[in-house]
Curated annotation (Swiss-Prot):
It is an enzyme of class 6 (ligase). This is DNA ligase 4. PROSITE patterns: BRCT, DNA_LIGASE_A1, DNA_LIGASE_A3. GO terms for molecular function: ATP binding; DNA binding; DNA ligase (ATP) activity; metal ion binding. The gene is LIG4. It catalyses: ATP + (deoxyribonucleotide)n-3'-hydroxyl + 5'-phospho-(deoxyribonucleotide)m = (deoxyribonucleotide)n+m + AMP + diphosphate.
Amino acid sequence: MADEGGLETGAHDELKGTEEQAVNFAPSPDFLWLCEQLFAKIDHVQFERANNLLTKPVTARYYEVISNFTTLWRTTVGNNIYPALRLILPYRDRRVFNIKDYTLIKAICAFLKLPKDSSTEKKLINWKQDAGRSVRLSKFCVEEIKKRRSEPQIDRNERITIDDLNGYLDQLAIERTEQGRSFKNLANSDIMNKCLTSMTFLEMQYFFDILLKNRPLGGHEHKLLNCWHPDAQDYLSVVSDLETVAKRLWDPSQRLGNQDLKINIGLAFAPQLATKLHVSYQKIGEKLGWDFFIEEKMDGERIQMHYTNFGSDIKFYSRRATDYTYLYGNNLKTGTLANFINLNKNVKDCVLDCEVVTFDSNNKIVLPFGMVKSSAKNMLSQDGIDTQGFHPLLMVFDVLYLNGATLVDLPYYKRREYLKQILTPTAHRIEIIKSIRANDEQMIKKSLEKALSVGSEGIILKRYDSRYVIASRSDDWIKIKPEYLEQFGENMDLVLMGRDPSKKDSLMLGLLDYEEVIQDSPIMVNSQSSEENSQRFRGFVSLCIIANGISNEEYKEIDRKTKGLWNDSEKIPPLEYMKFGSKVPRQWIDPKKSLILEIKARSLDNTRSSERKFAAGCTLFGGYCRQIREDKNWKTCYTLQEFERAKSGNNWRKRGSSKPQKVISKKRRYNIISSVNKALEDFAELEHRSDIFDGMYFYVLSDYFDGVKRKRIKKSEIQKVIVANGGQLVQNVITRNYNLNDLRIISSRNTVECNSLIVRGYDIISPKWVFDCLLSGKIMKLEPSHCFNFSKQLMDYAYKRIDQYGDPYERDINKYEWSSLTSEKICTTAKQQPDVQFDNSLMDVPHFLFHGRIVFLLSDNNNIQKESFMVDAYGGKVTNELSSANLVIVVGAVTQRRINDIRKQISSEVIKQDHPPRIPDMVSEGWLYDCIKQNTQVAEDNYRLP
């Protein structure tokens, strides 16, 4: 254990020295000055951008405004920017006002003395319906105030300064905590009235933003931090405290070292996170060196506890630096957790990494965190804590700082030893997460089986000798949890690309596509741009259409934020980076100016029609919108590469196909297409390989998606293959110096240009024909699989060349096709079945609500007739075999013992598989009723059982 205060004293002395120099030599500027010199100018740049008035690149203009402001502050005010930072970045400020839109609107209406339920009040409450995309609530409110009040005329010496406003806000935060959060208390606040009567309209606008914790700078926080000091952004991610950043980083010439970017006692930091890998247990074990700890994955909230001065000062911070100290206690005698902490008497300071879960003291079980979300809101007040039979339980798993010394560079096993030495658990209040040391695949399976049998989320594997890496997601920590049947993995943050307007708009969403760039220079560990530099933006590809799960309020919010940005489909979108399939929305929006929606799906739809409809090569089945992601933009949305990895890591089954099913083993399937991939590798270089395409001209319009391996072959790769085998490329079909009979137009996507050529009578060939020619070593006659869009006459000829199973009459099949045909199991009744694709739009019909659901109804009294009828009536199936179910619904009051028995049966499948399993979800009957009520399959998260 480190010496008490040894390292800490030096750190405080150093900080003290810097604090003495971070001072301002001039009086505090007016708040109006801050509004005019920074906020208003940033808004003006946004106005210039929206109206195409910029004479410089928009990023350069933003940096110009912000750099001028920071220079002006240094030269006219001083080196301490903390007073301004609290107002510029209010969402980073520690003060809590508890003011939401409705609270502020009602307080403003009271200030204006408007009658209750007046038209103006209703207009303000429903402001999103009338406000433009770039209009914030603050501006909307000020416009209404202007109509009823004249602007206050304030003498210069009576203006509110930045320091004055910070003082007022400090008092307001105390008032809102002690006197309550109602709008009446805010309306009656002397501070609120003082500000409203002493501010210009410009000041009011940004004052309202500060109260609402909005972003007056938009998304340009990093630009301000970089202009003030080159290390400010990195340092803020470590300490999460504006005051510390301002006091330490006042001189841009003084750079931080690696030691400075480590844990600071009392200041929140971004924790290390576990990675979820879609690989086998064998691969996971290899990554961890076959020496690791196995711990239960707790279903709670990540918390870091900062313990200082022998427990006289304790802080609790969430993963995102939210201060929950008022909730859990600030010393050993207060709160719902702090007063149960029992550390060694020699521990002066320490930082513990933990998870807070909810414990049911009546049934002695840990409750799923999703079940207590509503009660967690009540827990924000002291009266709501430790009631209704459950209370918070702190599960500790790591110690990162001890008596002045950081422990992050110590191996994990050593940190665990320290933790057990310094912390004495208190049953059901403060406990250490149990762990076992493991070194083989069987232990992973058994641990996961045991965790699932008691209703746990899963397990976490941690490398035995791993160090702790702040603000990272490391492969040294790997989480393993099952995927639920009828769900497609993790939630996805998708970008809005288009819509079909109607009574209930259908929104088209897509994925960000990029390609990896090989780095010539080494990547610095602390470089935030290293990941960005290794990826080159390619564009966006359409993935799905979503209409379920979006509330009327969210539709209004989407309309407001995208107002004026929609284009009708007659206007061609920027095809260089917007890729649609055959399904083109009636209106499209530039994804770079669009919104991000969080989507949950039941599974993938891999049918041939879906492959053509969407540029991603498939779509989502049962997609459901969870929320609008205000904290995300197009640069941080879900990528095509992440999507492909998620697909390859799971055996997602096809949906909606009524064609004869061809059952091909995974091994054979990869053998069949290996020669095509080999061809791509062999012809990747532009050296001459053959003369197969000699005398032929090719116009290539799109990439090609390999429907078997789920791999995309880029347009440029197809062109290289053609050139390497004697073909010539053309860039358009209008200007030509060749015979039209020698032209082959190649495409697998209904792009705008492709559709235009189809209308003009051109036949379009699939890229599959190119690769089949290479496999055969000669020009092949066209078969149906080669025809992307052909005239009826040519299609009739193509179908005459194959039998009912797709076997060609006029050419020899290669060994891969032979392997495919001999391994298929052909349905004998295939000829009588119509060749149709299931239309997923039918899922909107109530009778298909539970299509694909095979439900096991669990009840102690077998009184399940009503629920069984409801499942059947809405398109699902009820089964008595748990092994065939993809959903378990618990009906009525079922004993915990019976539920655990079912969980054990489900978890027993874990031991039989080499990958993390897919298991049926288990929900309460409330899920069934809410699905029918909302006419969509709602997310299961809030209905899971303890």
